[in-house]
């Protein structure tokens, strides 16, 4: 296709046979600017001005066309780069999702076996997770994002608190009630912070006390729930066919059934909230976690209650439908509140994950944050609101 400059050049020439085309020189004659005394006009007129204007016009048009072609090529190059980046991002997300699913299944199966085993197996596994999670918590407290505006507790205090947190589930299994022990431990840690060298800070005390409560005391309620509620779930059908070598029907207690339903409710909340947010997510839930949406949260609530009702019908616990709905709502609330709490800590710390222990998932806290408050809510609900523990 001819360019605009070529069209202008072709139309500027006369092809009529009545006269021949004569090319005028582009160099101005020497006499073209000669003037007589008193005259304001030159003796000879030339078409140089008209020709110069035409040349400038054609040059500008040609340059504009070349620039336009260059811009088009540049835009195509940018689009090509963006397309490659989008493909790489999709492949990366698909790889991360695949890794999360593989490690999620690899972790979920052993955890299910640990919950079924109960007793010391469950308690020791929980204590190990608590120890690692508490170490991650105190590392978050010492990170640049949080430590920038406060003075973190000394490292020896953080290590002592991690050990105390790990001992809480074990002491709960042995003594049942550890309120006095936890209070005594918190008092000793507070004294150690107050008599340290230098200038003690309130931020050190508050972050340490919260660490003991968040990483140690709250997870201990899972031991109370799984091992403390030893009343048999008499109406559970699966208990009748359970092998005698594994405990028989007596193995299926209220604590075991409630723990399985709570774990399943937390998993359902995370799964349905993720799928609902991807499909319907429009309205942000909170600035703490920008990726969470109200639509995904509502879908997570519906999914959690639905799974709780289905499992309660299958396991015949609790007997009341209203109790099943209330239990599902508490599991949902504990899951969301625990997730947002850890998101707030990580946001202040300026990190994406609490650690890198689990590929594709982050640290221990990133996986158990939804369970931290749920155990306490589930245990309190069964102890205070269900007659005969819902049997």
Swiss-Prot record:
GO terms for molecular function: phosphatidate cytidylyltransferase activity. Disulfide bonds: none annotated. This is Phosphatidate cytidylyltransferase 4, chloroplastic. Signal peptide: none annotated. The keyword Phosphoprotein does not apply. Residues 1-61 form a transit peptide. Its cofactor is Mg(2+). The chain crosses the membrane at residues 102-122, 175-195, 202-222, 254-274, 298-318, 321-341. Highest activities is obtained at about 30 mM CTP and 2 mM phosphatidic acid (PA). GO terms for biological process: CDP-diacylglycerol biosynthetic process; phosphatidylglycerol biosynthetic process. Belongs to the CDS family. Disruption phenotype: When associated with the disruption of CDS5, requires sucrose (Suc) treatment to grow. Pale yellow-green leaves with reduced chlorophyll levels but an increased chlorophyll a/b ratio. Reduced plastidial phosphatidylglycerol (PG) biosynthesis leading to abnormal thylakoid membrane development. Optimum pH is 7.5. It is found in: Plastid, Chloroplast membrane. May be involved in the synthesis of minor phospholipids and in modulation of IP3-mediated signal transduction. Promotes the biosynthesis of plastidial phosphatidylglycerol (PG) which is required for structure and function of thylakoid membranes and, hence, for photoautotrophic growth. The lineage of its organism: Eukaryota, Viridiplantae, Streptophyta, Embryophyta, Tracheophyta. One of its GO terms (cellular component) is chloroplast membrane.
């Amino acid at each position: 296709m001819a360019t605009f400059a070529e069209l202008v050049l072709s139309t500027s020439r006369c092809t009529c046979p009545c006269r021949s085309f004569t090319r005028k020189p582009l160099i101005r004659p020497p006499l073209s600017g000669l003037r007589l005394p008193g005259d304001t006009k030159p003796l000879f007129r030339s078409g140089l001005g008209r020709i110069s204007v035409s040349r400038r016009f054609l040059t500008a048009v040609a340059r504009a066309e070349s620039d336009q072609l260059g811009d088009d090529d540049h835009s195509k190059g940018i689009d090509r780069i963006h397309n490659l980046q989008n493909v790489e991002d999709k492949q990366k997300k698909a790889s991360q999702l695949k890794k999360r699913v593989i490690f999620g299944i690899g972790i979920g199966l052993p955890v299910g076996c640990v919950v079924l085993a109960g007793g010391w197996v469950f308690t020791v596994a929980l204590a190990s997770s608590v120890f690692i999670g508490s170490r991650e918590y105190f590392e978050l407290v010492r990170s640049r994002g949080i430590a920038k505006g406060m003075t973190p507790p000394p490292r020896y205090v953080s290590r002592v608190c991690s050990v105390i947190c790990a001992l809480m589930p074990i002491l709960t299994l042995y003594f049942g009630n550890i309120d006095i022990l936890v209070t005594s431990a918190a008092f000793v840690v507070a004294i150690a912070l107050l008599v340290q060298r230098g200038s003690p800070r309130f931020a050190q005390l508050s972050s340490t006390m919260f660490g003991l409560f968040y990483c140690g005391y709250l997870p201990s309620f899972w031991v109370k729930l799984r091992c403390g509620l030893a009343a048999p779930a008499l109406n559970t059908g699966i208990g009748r066919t359970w092998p005698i070598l594994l405990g028989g029907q007596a193995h299926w207690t209220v604590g075991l059934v409630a723990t399985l339903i709570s774990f399943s409710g937390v998993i359902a909340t995370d799964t349905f909230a993720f799928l609902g947010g991807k499909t319907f997510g429009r309205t942000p839930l909170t600035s703490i976690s920008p990726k969470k949406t109200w639509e995904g949260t509502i879908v997570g609530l519906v999914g959690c209650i639905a799974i709780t009702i289905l499992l309660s019908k299958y396991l015949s616990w609790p007997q009341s439908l209203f109790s099943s709905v209330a239990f599902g709502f508490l599991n949902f609330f504990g899951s969301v509140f625990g997730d947002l709490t850890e998101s707030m800590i990580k946001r202040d710390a300026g990190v994406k994950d609490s650690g890198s222990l689990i590929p594709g998932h982050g640290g221990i806290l990133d996986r158990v944050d939804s369970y931290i408050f749920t155990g306490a809510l589930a245990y309190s609900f069964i102890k205070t609101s269900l007659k005969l523990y819902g049997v």
